[in-house]
């Protein structure tokens, strides 16, 4: 039980009595950090949530943003970290299942999945096992329900050895006049429970997710992990679409964390009403289940609909057609109370407030002591460092992962995995871009700048595809919030994210907080994962693929001596300390928005775009060459900067808001004038060629190799480890 003594006292004061066993279990679930956001809610209020394209912000199963006159996008992001640590295949699969149901609940048809993952190093057998089976769980579930998994990102670090991060995004298209919400607004309506039956799996799933893991969690907490059932999910999806098309559905919500307790209490309370539930009507999978088990079960593939009683017969016909369990389990009442009956006996009778408004906890925040050692960074051969970086776990190609995903089902995927973001077709004129980002090492070193940079990087990835960024989603993964140092990280991260999102007018429309990502004193690197939705005309889509020999290569944006936290320091010199790249908000905004405006204006003359991030300029250039199977001839002597740079700074710095763009040679003057007019620093550094990857600094040739060589270094690491 996660209820504190103060919370128990509060419950008794509101009830005027002690809660019975069922009520106590239900409130324990709803007071959990996972359901109540009792630690994070005051901090999350700093996020901007309104914008010109926002239809629905945070608070429902998903956020909704406008894409075209006809279509909107429902999008959500969730974590399934604890379950995936205990049972990686099932934990990852049910994570996908839950976020897909969230999108269906809004009336939308899921068209895309992404995953943002964190693991320990593959040299550790347990981390390797978790990595393998998380990917299999995501792949099997997504492929079987026919929703493409089109992207995401992965990091490997020792701090994720015991606590992997499994964050999943789903987005779906919905016509604006067909949106439904997770509320029960009409007194007298009945609750239709449809889908899978209710069993004993997943009981205490949310309280399990609101505590630290231990060395015994793999055995002790396995029953708290839900059982995935993608085949039932497919039928649930089809039945839901038919119910929404056939009946006047007043509200829909999926049964995720907290099961029936969470679903019914939230639906009724959002509608300003209450619920009267008949426990005996709930379809069960197992015999002799107690009321406690029934109300706390998190069995998968279940949905609740608020419908008019006159539509029950039609609803039942649809459920039977799809061979799904179904029942009317109660009705909506005009008192804001949650009442459950077992036969004629009332076994729960409490006000909604005890399920939907847990008291806020004011957590202490304390900046941890920062220790920086004097470390000598020896000079290394640039070409050898390039090969090591390209083959390092965090930069190597993730094709082994995304090749297991069906990313072309539904035939909407225009730009496939491996670019700055995925591009998904809406109609003949419009597409949307979607991607996720976070550099967990940068957030560890400075949560404000690191988290702000995650938002900026995600926005820049959308811009690199030619899109206009319109909205953000997030999943905030941190350690134990009861520890002041962890809560300080959380507050600083949210502050940085809010500042960047506000500046770019890209509101957060949906998100999730995952605390207690710790195991016996080992805390994960703080990981606020950010996803950005962008809108792009189909004729204006850009990619990082180099196009024609002779195209001119420009670096746009200033580089600073910012190597702390870089992949170069981490993987070449085994150094992780100091201060990560800073946010220079006005400068970053000017560079990014200038590129955003130039791409559609000079669409035919700008031939490729890629933002510079992990690994710095040299890695960005290498990945463009690998992607396109074309070469580059570049000199880094005059890359833009406001300060003196070392050779390492020029090659490996991970400063924010920098882009590589290639332009047609006869358009160079026009592009240069446009950049200068907007006071954006840039430099012409070279040109595209048919083969050869050559990097020079003044007269010194630093790298001179074939594209085939760098491709080989970049594409075999995971395959070798997982063989």
Swiss-Prot record:
Binding site for Mg(2+) 2: 102, 254
Pfam families recorded: AIRS, AIRS_C, FGAR-AT_linker
Pathway as given in its UniProt record: Purine metabolism; IMP biosynthesis via de novo pathway; 5-amino-1-(5-phospho-D-ribosyl)imidazole from N(2)-formyl-N(1)-(5-phospho-D-ribosyl)glycinamide: step 1/2
Residues reported in the UniProt entry to bind ATP: 37, 474, 511
InterPro entries referenced in this protein's UniProt entry, alphabetically: PRibForGlyAmidine_synth_PurL, PurL_linker, PurM-like_C_dom, PurM-like_C_sf, PurM-like_N, PurM-like_N_sf
Gene Ontology annotations of biological process type: 'de novo' IMP biosynthetic process
Binding site for substrate: 79-82, 101, 226, 298-300, 514
Primary subcellular site in the record, as a coarse category: cytoplasm
Location relative to the cell: Cytoplasm
The reaction(s) this protein catalyses: N(2)-formyl-N(1)-(5-phospho-beta-D-ribosyl)glycinamide + L-glutamine + ATP + H2O = 2-formamido-N(1)-(5-O-phospho-beta-D-ribosyl)acetamidine + L-glutamate + ADP + phosphate + H(+)
GO cellular component terms attached to this protein's record: cytoplasm
The protein's Enzyme Commission number: 6.3.5.3
Keyword vocabulary terms for this entry: ATP-binding, Cytoplasm, Ligase, Magnesium, Metal-binding, Nucleotide-binding, Purine biosynthesis
Catalytic residues as annotated in Swiss-Prot or TrEMBL: 34, 80
Disulfide bonds: none
Residues binding Mg(2+) 1, per UniProt: 78, 512
A GO MF term: magnesium ion binding
Subunit structure: Monomer. Part of the FGAM synthase complex composed of 1 PurL, 1 PurQ and 2 PurS subunits.
Family: Belongs to the FGAMS family.
Annotated function: Part of the phosphoribosylformylglycinamidine synthase complex involved in the purines biosynthetic pathway. Catalyzes the ATP-dependent conversion of formylglycinamide ribonucleotide (FGAR) and glutamine to yield formylglycinamidine ribonucleotide (FGAM) and glutamate. The FGAM synthase complex is composed of three subunits. PurQ produces an ammonia molecule by converting glutamine to glutamate. PurL transfers the ammonia molecule to FGAR to form FGAM in an ATP-dependent manner.
The protein, known as: Phosphoribosylformylglycinamidine synthase subunit PurL
The organism of origin for this protein: Methanosphaera stadtmanae (strain ATCC 43021 / DSM 3091 / JCM 11832 / MCB-3)
Gene name in the database record: purL
